[in-house]
Amino acid sequence: MTHGASKTTPETTRAGRQARIVAILSSTSVRSQSELATLLADDGIDVTQATLSRDLEELGAVKLRGADGGVGVYVVPEDGSPVRGVSGGTARLSRLLSELLVSADSSANLAVLRTPPGAADYLASAIDRAALPYVVGTIAGDDTVFVAAREPMTGSELATVLESLNR
């Protein structure tokens, strides 16, 4: 036994590794598990494909195709973004809008956002977490998000604002 060596448990190692995965997926468009493994290795975290696959599953990560229909990127539903109303939520929302917004339309007090199939719930969650003062709430289907504007804003004005956040 070596004295002075720090003792790590599988639990802390897994938690630390998963926290780093969340950080990477929140800031970088990762298109494959091998790309993610390389980014982790760059941070000194060596991981097998089986472990990485298990981590992604435990984190609830999914691979979503972007608005351009190109290669999908991994996203984590609750990716450690700031809690509602805390600065930084709109930066994450802007990134997601740029990746997922296909089109925006409006009716009355609703902005109607189109996404690639399977991405609407994820985008709606990001809008909710951004805690925009002019948004009452969201409803998501498979590829459509209804965003309700807070009066006196109209759906058309809200759609324009959300499109402008799309960097």
UniProtKB/Swiss-Prot annotation:
Top-rank lineage group of the source organism: Bacteria
GO cellular component: cytoplasm
UniProt keyword annotation of Cell division present: no
InterPro entries: Arg_repress, Arg_repress_C, Arg_repress_C_sf, Arg_repress_DNA-bd, WH-like_DNA-bd_sf, WH_DNA-bd_sf
GO biological process, one term: regulation of arginine biosynthetic process
Principal subcellular localisation of the protein: cytoplasm
Places the protein is found: Cytoplasm
Single GO term (MF): DNA binding
Listed pathway(s): Amino-acid biosynthesis; L-arginine biosynthesis [regulation]
UniProt keyword annotations, A-Z: Amino-acid biosynthesis, Arginine biosynthesis, Cytoplasm, DNA-binding, Repressor, Transcription, Transcription regulation
HAMAP family: Arg_repressor
PANTHER family membership: ARGININE REPRESSOR
Similarity field: Belongs to the ArgR family.
Free-text function comment from the UniProt entry: Regulates arginine biosynthesis genes.
NCBIfam families: argR_whole, PRK03341.1
Protein name as catalogued: Arginine repressor
Species of origin: Mycobacterium leprae (strain TN)
Record gene name: argR
